[in-house]
Amino acid sequence: MSNVFDSDSPTNLAEYSVSELSGSIKRTVETAFDQVRVRGEISGYRGPHSSGHAYFALKDDRARIDAVIWKGTFSRLKFRPEEGMEVIATGKVTTFPGSSKYQIVIETLEPAGAGALMALIEERKRKLGAEGLFDAARKKRLPFMPRVIGVVTSPTGAVIRDILHRISDRFPVHVLVWPVKVQGEGSGEEVANAIRGFNALEPAGLIPRPDVLIVARGGGSLEDLWSFNDEIVVRAAAESRIPLISAVGHETDWTLIDYAADVRAPTPTGAAEMAVPVKAELEAQAAALAARLQGCMNRQMDQRRQSVRALMRALPSLDQLLALPRRRFDEAAAGLGRGLELNTINKRRGFERVGAHLRPDLLSGRIAERRQTLNERIVRAERMVERLIDRSKSRIDRAEAILASLPARFKTQTDRSREALANLSRHGDTAIRHQLARARAELSAQDRVLQSLSYKNVLKRGYAVIRDEDDRPVSQAAALSAGSAVSIEFSDGRIGAVTTEGGAPPASLKKRPAREAGDPPKQGSLF
């Protein structure tokens, strides 16, 4: 400062340089406003700078003042400043001589009453609700019996101990704890990152993915619970693919994460109770259900047993079931033998009648036809017998199938009946074979008789058969005239010939003397 007495100034006012005046103002302001409380609305807040300091302004409807929160102070704040929030800032006013500006250096910051915070919460609730983050359709059902539970909370304190103790008492399962800060600067980001981190785990990874999440914190003031009203936390909870239980504060404390979570628990202990059932209760329910099931099974068995007894009483006995098939089988077996015998007799008689009128040269063809017919009838008879036997066996098999469901006391009777049927079948087969053998033997004997009567056997003894042009046998010489063409059949074939004379035998042929009685014939008899 210059000496006022040496100055030539016409006034008594002191003269200051710009620096002197700025420094004097700075000292005056900092002395007068060394500790002040300012109420205003946060404006121009963009979060902490890269240096860690936060720069913004406090304003009301008529004025505005710049504000700064240094890095060390910012980390100790109980809640995170937000644009438009009405707060009460405590600090000191300072100026910058180089720019003639002043600002308040904030040392503590608190909301301007619960009403301001609640108004901010309501505004944020309306905004997020309009996006559908709180819709009931987004809510997921909690798993009945989770294998792994993820807990997002502070690793120290009573909350995690209460949750672990409650889960261990009710139904011990694997618990994964993601430690986070639950209040203060950066706590909201940590909670949101923990929720997203659990969702990023692979179901079959080294660290198992939880089946349900619990986001928990103990009770506190509205400022203490403010991190769970952060938009980043609410969005992470709404986007979680894992069912999420919010357990923040006490039953009367509501935060925005409670609306985005799938289920809200009144306390952290209540969240543990919602996450797992009571093992003892499940065991008791299982035992009760097992007892009911056993009772139902016993009643069903009794009813089925009574039904079987009633069916057994209604079923006929084994002898009654087999009586009709056995009688039919006996009748078929008896009638078959008699029928074959009568058929053989009738065929023999018919053969004898027909054979008396047939020429020897036609006997062989008729015999072949009869033999074929007889063989066909024998085959049909055998097939008929087989069908009768198969039919009887099928009926008995059906009867056995019906009786298979009856108690074991009928098994012995069934075995005896089966053995008797087998004996009857064997005896019937034996009788039929004997009848067929006798029929074949008789047929062979008749065949031999017919062969012996055949004229071809006579031809083998030196005789011949003469046939006219129409292939009719010629039995008298008068039937031929001179020049007639004839065929002569010998035992080894035929030759053609022409007659030279007709009528009586020629005179050159002398009559042979008659064979004396007792002389043996030189040629065998035709018969």
From Swiss-Prot:
- Keyword Cytoplasm in annotation: yes
Catalysed reactions, semicolon-separated: Exonucleolytic cleavage in either 5'- to 3'- or 3'- to 5'-direction to yield nucleoside 5'-phosphates
**One Gene Ontology cellular component annotation held by this UniProt entry:** cytoplasm
Kindly give the InterPro entries that the UniProt entry links to this protein: Exonuc_VII_L, Exonuc_VII_lsu_C, OB-fold_nuc-bd_dom
Compartment list: Cytoplasm
Q: Which residues form a coiled coil?
A: none
Which GO biological process annotations does it have?
DNA catabolic process
Q: What is its EC number?
A: 3.1.11.6
According to the record, the residues making up region (Disordered) are: 496-527
What is the name listed in the Swiss-Prot or TrEMBL entry for this protein?
Answer: Exodeoxyribonuclease 7 large subunit
- Organism placement in taxonomy: Bacteria, Pseudomonadati, Pseudomonadota, Alphaproteobacteria, Hyphomicrobiales
What is the name of the gene encoding this protein? xseA
